[in-house]
Every structure is written in C-alpha cells, then in structure tokens.
C-alpha cells in the first residue's frame, strides 16, 4: 500500500483504521475509529505478531506493514453469496434431542444464484476496487439494496460505474469509506434510478455534495453525516426535486460560513441538523420548510428558548429533537416551555405529547407571562408583544382574563385604592416629622417590621424612634403595631385594606 500526503483506509487484524502520512516519513500514523478500544486493539495486534509502534500515545506502522489482504467486489460477492459447502441437516444436543433444519438449503441455493439476489450487504469486507469490465446488469439484475460500508474504497468512479449497470438498484450505502478522490473522472454519469444514498463519514466537502445532487437527481433520502460540509451560497439541494429526508448531523462546521443559500432545504420533510454548530433557530430558512414534519437540532448551542418561536410558522412540524439542558432551566420546565411555544408538536425528543401535558405546558406558560409582566413592569400589550409575540394566541385559546399591566403613579396623580387581586400595590407614605410624602410599592406578603425598615431607610429615620400608623381612607380605621407580635403581621393580615401609612415621631405623643 502506498499513499501520498493525506489519509486512506486500511485493515489491521480485521479492524478498519485510517492511515495518515506527512512528507517523506517512512511511517504511517494509525487513527482508530471512536468505537475501537485502543488498548485492546494494540494487544490483539501484538498477540498476532503485528509490528505496531506505540509512541507518546500514538500508534504507527512502517510502510512494509502486513495489512490485511484486500479484495475486489466480485471476490467478496462470491465469497459471501456463492459459498458451496453443504449445510448440516440436523444438530444433536447433549441431552440426546435432535433438531432438524428445514428450508435452509433452499435459502442457500437461492443465495448461490446471484441473479435472484435483491439485497447485498458487504459491510467491512476489505473491498478496495470494483472490476468495471464485467456486465453487472447480467450478474446482478435484481439487486435493489447495496451496502458497501466500511471498506477500503478511495475512488468513487468504480462504484458509480457499478450503479449505472444495476437497473433495479434503489438504495446505496457507502458509510465510512474514506474517498480521497471522490470525483475521479471527467466522465459525467447520471444515475436517475437511485432513490436513497448514504455517505456518512466519507470525508466529503461542499463541492462533493454539489456533484452528488447533479449525479443522483432522483434522490428521496440522503445521509451526509460526519463529513466536512460547510453550507455556503454554492451549496444547495434544490436540484433534488424529490428529496424528502436529509441528514447533515455531525458536520461540525456546517454553519461556519458567512452566508448560505436560503433555499438550501426547500421542500424537505425530515431534516437532521444535530451537532452542526447551529447557534440560533433564526438561521433556519423556515419560509422554505413549509413541508417539514421532523426536525433534529439537538446538541447545538441553542440557549435562547424564545428563538423557538421561529418554528411556530411550521404548521406541519410534528416531531422535534432538541437538547433541553442547554436552556439553563430545569429540564422539566424547559420541556413545558418548548411544548407551549410550538403548538403543532405531537412528539418531543421521541416521546409523545399527551393532551394533558400540552394543557399543563400552556397554562405554565401563562404563569410565566404574568411573572414577566410583574418583574419587568410591562405597561401595555405592545410592550409585551415585542418580547413574547405569540402570547395572545394562548391567552385567547384558553379564554383567560386580561392581564393587569403595570401602572406608574406619582405623588401628584396618586389616588387611594384597595389591595386586592394584586401582588404589589402602590401605597402613599407620609412622614409628619419631616413633612415629606412619597409613594412606595409594597408586597402583600411583607411583614410590618420589614415595611417599617424600608420606610425608615427612605426617610433616613431610625425605626424605633417613630410610630407607624397603617390607615384606610375607606373605612376610617387605623392600626398601629405596638407589640412584637403585631410587628410580625403581614400586610394581608391587617384588619383592613391599607392605603396610607403615616410616620410620627414618638416624642410627639400623637398616635
């Protein structure tokens, strides 16, 4: 095996690895797939007397290393599907019971007849090349599904020639083949009969994707996961008029370009964008995704839950996958808010949404809106709508009473009111001693001692040298806490609705 600067696939002890070389180095560095245990791999190789070199946590092999022998496509095909050894007709257990096999010979005889094969799976058969000089239309006329994953292909053109000779072929899987020369010929071949293509983890870039869309114009399902694709103005799938399912998961720099085609996902039903550096749902061209029913945007850095409002326009969206823990909220709370914001959802993270769960989610959302109004002192509908554009839809669907917005008041225009059905209320405060008057907002659950401390702070007077009279103009009553027990009363425990608080100096004797 010989490679120049770059990467290529090889097989060592029946384990698929990637080899890299830089410059004129006499060694290849061995890179293992994520699912391979490095320690176990090294032990197995040494046990089989494979001369691996381990240095500083990296694995190397010399150029003359005894790699596993490669096969051609036909060699692998005949090895698996034309195996001629007889099957046992029965098996006898230790107990003496004998079990006869029925029908297996018939199955094997059909496998031996390659012309009747409809599904071919040659996963990890160390296939390096395809003999393009044969007429595969006569050898494999009925093949519908072809899986050549985890082999040693480094050029795509022989596979393309094979597909062009299989008229019944509909599904092609080429996962984990590292194509160092994806477009290897100037010859243009169209494969109009292929409807599903999977090229996950094949080292493809944006130019390769554009070539795929032109070569396979009838694709309905396309998997491009774990490649090196970057969406740009030159990247588009609009040539694939029949495309329904597209997966670009684990393309870590997918959204790193400054701009990308707005019609890149036009007409797609199922879209997977997990782990693609998507930081804001607003980056999705939702106006071109009106047919979308499934969307996976999990494992992306989406932290603003309000950005999900962009998905409300997708009326056909039924299933959403998203990482709830990224919203800096408890997972159960984040789940309720996501459900409430997207009314079309029937499934979230592969779990069905029940009618009761949707009701709970929307009612919880309304409580969050009320809290938002109070905490931010929102004054009117327009101000709230700028923050939460769709709050009124949920309000009307549940026929909820109108929100009581924050009302600003000054000393001049303040009028007395009653503390009722409100969390906070403006109370007029006057200090007889200093001749000052002001308006404070008090919480109905505050203790009188806390209120006295707050008022004393504003008027710069000691708490224990003044008398505080809580009065009501409507009932003509007053209440002056004199004992510790009264001091611990809360505002709603007073025998009347408080509208005034007067502060007197104790030495005046006026209570």
From Swiss-Prot:
It comes from Schizosaccharomyces pombe (strain 972 / ATCC 24843) (Fission yeast). Residues 325-364 form the LRRCT domain. Required for microtubule and spindle assembly. Involved in the proper folding of alpha-tubulin. One of its GO terms (molecular function) is unfolded protein binding. LRR repeats lie at residues 116-137, 142-163, 168-190, 191-217, 218-241, 242-264, 267-288, 291-312. Interacts with alp1 and alp11. It comes from the Eukaryota. It is found in: Cytoplasm, Cytoskeleton. PROSITE patterns: LRR. This is Cell polarity protein alp21. The gene is alp21. Its main location: cytoplasm.
């Amino acid at each position: 095996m010989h490679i120049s600067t770059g990467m290529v696939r090889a097989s060592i002890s029946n384990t698929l690895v990637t080899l890299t070389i830089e410059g004129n180095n006499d060694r290849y560095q061995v890179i293992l797939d994520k699912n391979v245990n490095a320690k176990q791999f090294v032990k197995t190789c040494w046990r089989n007397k494979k001369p691996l070199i381990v240095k500083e946590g990296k694995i190397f092999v010399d150029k003359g290393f005894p790699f596993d022998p490669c096969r051609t496509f036909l060699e692998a095909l005949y090895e698996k599907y034309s195996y001629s050894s007889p099957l046992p007709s029965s098996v006898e257990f230790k107990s003496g019971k004998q079990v006869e096999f029925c029908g297996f010979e018939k199955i094997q005889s059909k496998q031996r007849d390659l012309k009747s094969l409809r599904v071919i799976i040659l996963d990890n058969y160390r296939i390096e090349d395809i003999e393009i000089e044969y007429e595969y239309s006569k050898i494999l006329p009925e093949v519908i599904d072809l899986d050549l994953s985890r082999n040693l292909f480094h050029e795509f053109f022989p596979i393309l020639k094979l597909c062009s000779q299989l008229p019944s072929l509909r599904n092609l899987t080429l996962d984990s083949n590292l194509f160092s020369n994806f477009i290897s010929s100037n010859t243009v071949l169209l494969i109009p009969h292929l409807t599903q293509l999977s090229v996950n983890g094949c080292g493809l870039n944006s130019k390769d994707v554009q070539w795929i869309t032109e070569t396979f114009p009838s694709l309905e399902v396309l998997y491009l996961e774990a490649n090196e694709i970057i969406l740009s103005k030159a990247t588009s799938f609009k040539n694939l008029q029949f495309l329904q399912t597209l997966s670009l998961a684990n393309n870590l720099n997918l959204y790193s370009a400054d701009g990308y085609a707005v019609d890149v996902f036009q007409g797609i039903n199922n879209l997977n964008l997990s782990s693609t550096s998507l930081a804001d749902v607003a980056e999705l061209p939702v106006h071109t995704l009106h047919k979308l029913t499934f969307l996976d945007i999990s494992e992306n850095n989406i932290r603003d839950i309000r950005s999900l409002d962009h998905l409300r326009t997708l009326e056909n969206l039924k299933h959403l996958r998203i990482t709830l823990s990224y919203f800096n909220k408890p997972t159960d709370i984040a789940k309720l808010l996501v459900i409430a914001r997207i009314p079309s959802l029937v499934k979230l993270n592969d779990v069905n949404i029940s009618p009761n769960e949707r009701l709970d989610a929307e009612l919880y959302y309304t409580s969050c809106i009320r809290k938002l109004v109070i905490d931010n002192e929102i004054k009117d509908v327009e101000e709230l709508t700028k923050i939460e554009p769709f709050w009124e839809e949920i309000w009307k669907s549940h026929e909820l009473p109108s929100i009581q917005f924050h009302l600003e008041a000054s000393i001049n225009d303040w009028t007395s009111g009653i503390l009722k059905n409100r969390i906070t209320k403006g109370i007029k405060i006057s200090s007889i001693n200093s001749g000052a008057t002001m308006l404070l907002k008090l919480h109905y659950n505050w203790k009188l001692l806390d209120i006295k401390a707050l008022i004393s702070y504003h008027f710069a007077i000691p708490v224990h040298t003044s008398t505080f009279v809580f009065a009501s103009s409507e009932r003509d009553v007053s209440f002056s806490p004199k004992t510790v027990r009264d001091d611990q009363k809360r505002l709603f425990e007073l025998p009347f609705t408080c509208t005034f608080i007067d502060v007197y100096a104790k030495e005046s004797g006026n209570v």
